[in-house]
Design a protein with these regions (language model features):
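Transmembrane-helix motifs of polytopic, lipid-linked glycan transferases
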Residues: 92-109, 147-152
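Membrane-water interface at transmembrane helix exits
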Residues: 74, 78, 103-107, 154, ...
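Membrane-helix interface and helix-disruption motif detector
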Residues: 79-89, 107-110, 129-141
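Membrane-interfacial loop-to-transmembrane alpha-helix junctions, especially the N-terminal start
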Residues: 19-25, 56-59, 106-118, 158-159
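Membrane-interface coil-to-helix junctions
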Residues: 34-94
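Membrane-interface micro-motifs in multi-pass membrane enzymes
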Residues: 63-67, 114-159
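Start-transfer (signal-anchor) and selected internal transmembrane alpha helices
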Residues: 1-31
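Eukaryotic intrinsically disordered, low-complexity segments enriched for acidic and Ser/Thr/Pro residues
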Residues: 82-83, 95-99, 120-123
Length: 159
């Protein structure tokens, strides 16, 4: 919305659901419920067969290859899938962080985008989870790491 339009619409009521915190809250609550009750993270854990151990040999299998640390963290977070509600909660939190970092990056770039556009990566991740053949934790964590690196670049002083 342009500033001139904002002045014209000042006295008119706005839709509560389509904009602001209420719509965003409804989206992430729906996201959580869909992952918890429809996708069932326990089935994802069973389908991928992800194991995790706090041992040095297990860590060395990950640390010796590119992207291994991300896979290690993904294997750790996949253990939350033993409880459907906990796996859904952690995945929703990761997607919410993706939303927050995306919003911050858009403001650094000088733009204003509605929240409905900023949740599109979460929807794409949700579509991928419906297949039960994906690396369920690697995709959101990889996206989160990439966005965090871009945000870090913007925050570096004197660039």
């Amino acid at each position: 919305m342009r500033p001139a339009d904002a002045k014209e619409n000042r006295g008119q009521p706005r839709s509560r659901f389509g904009s602001g915190a209420l719509g965003l809250l409804a989206f992430f609550v729906s996201f959580f419920l869909y992952v918890w009750l429809r996708i069932e993270p326990g089935v994802l854990l069973h389908a991928t067969g992800t194991l995790f151990f706090f041992s040095d040999p297990f860590w060395k299998t990950f640390s010796s290859r590119p992207g291994g640390v991300l896979d290690y963290v993904a294997a750790f977070l996949a253990q939350s899938d033993h409880f459907n509600w906990l796996g859904a909660l952690v995945l929703t939190a990761v997607c919410f962080l993706i939303f927050l970092i995306s919003r911050r990056l858009v403001t650094f770039a000088g733009g204003v985008v509605p929240w409905t556009v900023l949740v599109l990566p979460s929807l794409v991740l949700l579509l991928g989870l419906n297949q039960y053949q994906t690396l369920a934790w690697n995709m959101p964590l990889g996206l989160l790491l990439s966005l965090a690196a871009a945000l870090g670049w913007f925050l570096v002083p004197g660039k």
